[in-house]
């Protein structure tokens, strides 16, 4: 995936819904930060090639859902505002979300609902855009759903979290009537739910899409690499609450295996679709 966009799939049926992964490009993250306290010798031969500064390329996979006459967008990537990013994060080919959507004939004004798992710059940067020199909502008709606690944290960050929460991604929402804050589990429309998944942030969430006995989970920053799906103890240094992350991963991944859920992983190589299996007692990520 180094510096190159992988061809994305067509619409995928899920019961009476349709899913499509759309990409905002590629983000480069310091590989040591991605894998946290896990020693380099354990992961360096298993990951994608690093650049000369030891950065790891990761996807920016967003999800379109068509259901019940609605168009739902889960996550918006870094966006195209040339947004500053935290030190150690270099952006390559970011800001491609709208072009990727346009190739499918979907315009910003066609989006009814936007869902953010959390408000770090690489998950909500495309919520806003410069229009006629002023910050505005990218999706002018959409209602924007996210956890109330995440909104409060993003607007009152501490010294550790401040670098990831950027005011330019938040201010137009605060001034609009389109912000929908939820607490805990929340159904956005029938079959589409926001589920708490704390750890990466205290109010991080995932998104469940269920229809006709089939289920997909968009897992946000539950993991930052597919190796973390296979190895529970591998936790990113970006996680605010690593021990909480561990318990959340156990709960969600055990459920995903038991119920054969389709997983959509934002930072896996595009399109980030796959399932987690138990093979001879070990977790195995099977990318689609």
Where are these regions (language model features)?
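Metallo-beta-lactamase
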Residues: 92-106, 110-122, 129, 138-196, ...
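Residue-level marker for buried hydrophobic side chains located in beta-strands
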Residues: 72-74, 115, 144, 216-218, ...
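Conserved beta-strand hairpin/beta-sheet module of binuclear metal-dependent hydrolase folds
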Residues: 9-104, 206-221, 225
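Active-site metal-binding loops of divalent metal-dependent hydrolases
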Residues: 24-26, 76-79, 119, 149-150, ...
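Cap/insert and terminal regions of metallo-dependent hydrolase folds
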Residues: 88-99, 212-288
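Metal-dependent catalytic neighborhoods of phosphoester/phosphodiester hydrolases
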Residues: 87-90, 124-134, 275-276
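Short, P/G- and charge-enriched loop/turn segments at secondary-structure junctions
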Residues: 48-53, 132-133, 194
């Amino acid at each position: 995936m180094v510096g190159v966009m992988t061809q994305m799939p067509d619409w995928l049926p899920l019961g009476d819904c349709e899913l499509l992964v759309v990409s905002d490009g590629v983000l480069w993250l310091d590989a040591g930060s991605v894998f946290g306290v896990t020693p380099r010798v354990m992961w360096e031969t298993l990951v994608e090639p690093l650049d000369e500064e030891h950065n790891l390329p990761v996807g920016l996979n967003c999800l379109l859902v068509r259901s019940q006459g609605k168009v739902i967008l889960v996550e918006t990537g870094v966006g195209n505002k040339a947004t500053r990013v935290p030190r150690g994060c270099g952006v390559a080919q970011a800001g491609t979300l709208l072009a990727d959507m346009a190739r499918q004939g979907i315009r910003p004004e066609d989006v009814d609902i936007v869902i953010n798992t959390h408000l770090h710059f690489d998950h909500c940067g495309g919520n806003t855009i410069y229009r006629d020199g002023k910050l505005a909502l990218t999706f002018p008709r959409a209602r924007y759903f996210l956890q109330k606690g995440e909104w409060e944290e993003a607007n009152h960050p501490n010294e550790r979290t401040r670098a990831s929460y950027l005011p330019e991604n938040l201010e137009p929402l605060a001034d609009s009537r389109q912000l929908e804050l939820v607490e805990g589990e929340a159904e956005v429309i029938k079959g589409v739910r926001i589920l708490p998944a704390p750890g990466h942030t205290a109010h991080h969430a995932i998104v469940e899409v269920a229809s006709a006995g089939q289920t997909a989970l968009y897992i946000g920053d539950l993991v930052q690499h597919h190796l973390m799906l296979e190895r529970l103890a591998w936790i990113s240094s970006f996680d605010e609450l690593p021990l909480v992350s561990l318990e959340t991963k156990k709960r969600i991944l055990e459920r995903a295996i038991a119920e054969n859920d389709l997983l959509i992983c934002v930072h896996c190589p595009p399109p980030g679709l796959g399932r987690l299996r138990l093979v001879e007692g070990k977790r195995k990520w099977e990318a689609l």
